[in-house]
Amino acid sequence: MTGKEENKQQQHVNFPWKRLVAGAVAGTADVWACHPLDRIKTQLQNNPGKSIVGTFGDIVSKGKGFTGGVNALYEGILPMTAEAIFKVGIRYFAFSWFTEQYKTTVYKGETLNKKQQFGANLLGGAFAGTIESFVVVIPCELLKVRHMTQEHNKSFGTVFRDVLREEGFQGLYKGGSATLLRQITNHMIRFPTFYAISDYLKGGDHSVHLPVWQNLSAGAIAGTASTLFNNPLDTIKTRMQKQGQNQTTMQVVRGIYQETGVKGYWAGVIPRILRVAPGQAITWAVVELVMGILEPSSKKH
């Protein structure tokens, strides 16, 4: 096999530390671009009877001075940025590390065909979702939900101390089962979907770096697909993590159905898509952009 052919058949993921850096940069970009949509989505899931416009009005009318008005949409963005740096960095590192280990162990380092690569990406996504959930996502999601749905303007630090004082360390993992399942299904869908689209656009040549708009499009499609599939898990997770909700997962599931029927599981799905689709578009585009800088020898369309 010639050097050109070897380069063309190179697999998706190499150098996990580079993916760690790329993920951290991408996570920061995602939060700063999409945090307002996340606020609206979280409020809608806890108040399903509200409209998007009504929820927007409630948020911007909350608080005084710097925390009031449109600034309220960015409340809590600094701790969310810190979370994103670790979360997305760990996600891409875990995915890269697992898929490399999987290919080495199962396929002895041989080049994978499309079906084998899809399976590796599927399992890698599940592994990445599991690792990021336990290390970062579950406790940070709980603090985010408590902070966004509180009646008083407490800081993130105060909310964190309140949880530890009233519920102990285990309180940070309340609603963890729903969050874990959401993250696993998220990335079992996003990684294979993005790379399947990317492979098609690259014509099978993994040395090619796609233009930004194509990575944006592939990321948005991957994000939308995962959201449509697992929005019920996100709704259940948000309800369980809201302060004062001391219910099991099944109790929350039954409660949502009794209140609003099946449609209740899809509360906030539109703002969640409006949040996740651009967020994933930005994340994937930035990851690929940073990888293009870290691996400048690759070709471009």
UniProtKB/Swiss-Prot annotation:
Solcar repeats lie at residues 14-101, 116-200, 210-293. The keyword Repeat applies. It is found in: Mitochondrion inner membrane. GO terms for molecular function: succinate:fumarate antiporter activity. PANTHER family: SUCCINATE/FUMARATE MITOCHONDRIAL TRANSPORTER-RELATED (PTHR45788), SUCCINATE_FUMARATE MITOCHONDRIAL TRANSPORTER (PTHR45788:SF2). Mitochondrial solute carriers shuttle metabolites, nucleotides, and cofactors through the mitochondrial inner membrane. GO terms for biological process: fumarate transport; succinate transport. Pfam families: Mito_carr (PF00153). One of its GO terms (cellular component) is mitochondrion. Belongs to the mitochondrial carrier (TC 2.A.29) family. Residues 38-65, 139-174, 230-275 are mitochondrial matrix. Residues 1-19, 87-117, 192-212, 297-301 are mitochondrial intermembrane. Keywords: Membrane, Mitochondrion, Mitochondrion inner membrane, Repeat, Transmembrane, Transmembrane helix, Transport. The chain crosses the membrane at residues 20-37, 66-86, 118-138, 175-191, 213-229, 276-296. The keyword RNA-binding does not apply. It is a multi-pass membrane protein. This is Mitochondrial substrate carrier family protein Z.
